[in-house]
Design a protein with these regions (language model features):
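Structural motif corresponding to the early beta-alpha repeats
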Residues: 72-98
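Generic structural signal for helix capping and beta-alpha/helix-loop junctions
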Residues: 59, 86-89, 126-129
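Generic beta-strand or strand-like secondary-structure segments
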Residues: 64-68, 82, 100-107
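Active-site beta-loop-alpha junctions enriched in small/polar residues
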Residues: 21-23, 53-55, 82-86, 122-125
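N-terminal binding-site loop/beta-alpha segment at the start of enzyme catalytic domains
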Residues: 1-77, 115
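Glycine/proline-rich, positively charged
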Residues: 92-137
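Conserved catalytic core of Hanks-type protein kinase domains
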Residues: 42, 82, 111
């Protein structure tokens, strides 16, 4: 596996990343055991960059991923999630306020069973006021 540093962060990530949207049933339903096994296999094979969002499966992807991550040493992966776009009960919402972004990070850490998240991305900024994203989010 080839690894590259993200800018000057010191974070070295695999060229192939694990996009966890499918753990939330975004494309089709997946058994939780299969989803967790997929995470284990990816990390075991050297894929150390995992990307997810609370929006994927309306929190389900983070919840399922968290069950897998609980069993993997924290130094084996770089974790990325997002703020700004959310969903619940089939309803999509966007909130780029600093307050909601901060709340979202803590909520994600709880669902993911981690003490910290390495990277936070702003999800779907085309729906946001860019001044708010730059100055507040």
């Amino acid at each position: 596996m080839i690894y590259n540093e993200i800018g000057k962060t010191g974070l070295r990530v695999s060229n192939l990343s694990f996009g966890a949207s499918s753990l939330g049933g975004v494309f089709h339903q997946i058994r939780e055991t299969e989803a967790i096994d997929a995470v284990f296999t990816a990390v075991e094979k050297g894929m150390n960059f995992i990307d997810v969002s609370p929006y994927y499966g309306h929190y389900k992807a983070e919840t399922v991923l968290g069950k897998a991550l609980k069993e993997i040493p924290r130094n084996k992966y770089i974790l990325s999630t997002k703020v700004g776009r959310y969903g619940k009960d089939g309803v999509n919402t966007w909130d780029y306020s600093g307050k909601r972004a901060t709340e979202s990070v803590y909520e994600s850490m709880e669902r993911l069973n981690v003490d910290y998240i390495d990277l936070i991305n702003v999800h779907d900024i085309e729906f946001a006021d860019l001044n708010q994203v730059v100055n507040e989010t």
